[in-house]
């Protein structure tokens, strides 16, 4: 039962969607920020 609960929590629609959205937005913002910082340093 505990494993099922954990699996349900980890495999829930909201957490997965949030994680996916964050992962999709994070890399882009991080790359953009890094590129901007690199350009500013140059």
UniProtKB/Swiss-Prot annotation:
It comes from the Bacteria. It is found in: Spore core. Induction: Expression is sigma G-dependent. Keywords: Sporulation. The gene is sspL. Residues 21-36 have a biased composition (Basic and acidic residues). InterPro entries: SASP_SspL. This is Small, acid-soluble spore protein L. GO terms for biological process: sporulation resulting in formation of a cellular spore. Residues 1-42 are annotated as: Disordered. It comes from Bacillus subtilis (strain 168).
